Amino acid sequence: MERGTTLVTEASAPIEAHTDEAQTPPSVFDVAVIGSGPAGSQSAVSAAHQTRSVLVIEAGAVSQRKGRAFWSKSVEFQDAPVFPGITGPRLATALSAWMSAQVGRMVTIGGKPRHVGIWRRGGMVLRVTRVEPDEGVHAPAGYLFAIEASTGALKAGTELTTERFLARSLVVASGFEDIWPDIDVTEGADRLYQTHRILFRYAGNRKGWHVCIRCDGHLHLDEHIAVVASGDFAWSIARGAQDFTGHITILTNGADPDFSDARLETLAARNIEVITEPIAAHIGKGTDLLGLKLSSGREVFADGFFVDYGLKANSEYLASNDGWNLKTDDEGLLVVDEDGAVLGADGNAVPGLFAAGDIVAGQRNLIATAFGLGQNAGLSAADLMREW
């Protein structure tokens, strides 16, 4: 999953605890988690396991917006913990079942009733703000997180269906969007997956587009790999590809290659061609991507196509005009401390705010890494609830 994600089509059911008998959720959750990929799921399970009430808000439940792993439609991950091989959709199903096992319910601990477990809600988070708690409401961060989410269909000309949730802590696990090259785009489309519908036909298949050389390079042992990128992105993929093959071609799609003389010499010594022509169209059969047609009419064929055009962090709901001033890297990913707490621009941890998975700066964007970061953030959020 190196380099993930968390559009809205239909309304979801009210909050449920995923039991035979619906359990009433708390008015204020101990932990809210935005995102239900490996990092979000692990955060939720870890916090629930520590007897906390957890709300998971899942964009994919009400939209076409899916995490990077989900789009591996026919390619099996072989480095996901426990599974010898599993596709993205099957992994998503397994994560869902895992969270559902942490039933939202009431328990009594030390004579005091407490909500514990996981409640899940389909929704696209629009805004997160900090609000003062009502008198008597436990707020270990000094405030509560108010989360506004669209929980109904997004249709032109209709008002948003929104709901507001409150939590004592928040784990951001919404990942990022991969930026895709403009090849065979559908002009006038207003959604990402409509704009790139032809490209997505070939995404996540063995003979198709890949976004992670560490994850999918093994599919093309000693085969021809095409790298569609430029600059550091292209260099990183090409260096990774050498572990799997010696047959590599770089296509910059009209961009300046942006390689130093030393890098160009290294590529030339290994017979790696750098093609700077713009790419005009896909050459495919069914869901298999066979090659790319260039603007000159030249056709370049390969067995696998690895792309990197950068990313867009899914953290727009933490807007500066709502009082958020967070520390990020150059790509907008959140900087955290050793406990998974998000840092403010001043370098200090923001009380109650944590992050995990691909949204975190400076981490390997891999499934196992996401699980580890998720557990760290989930446990840190859970520990914040302790009275002493």
Range-by-range predicted roles:
Residues 35, 169-175, 180-182, 191, ...:
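Short, well-ordered coil/turn residues at beta-beta hairpins
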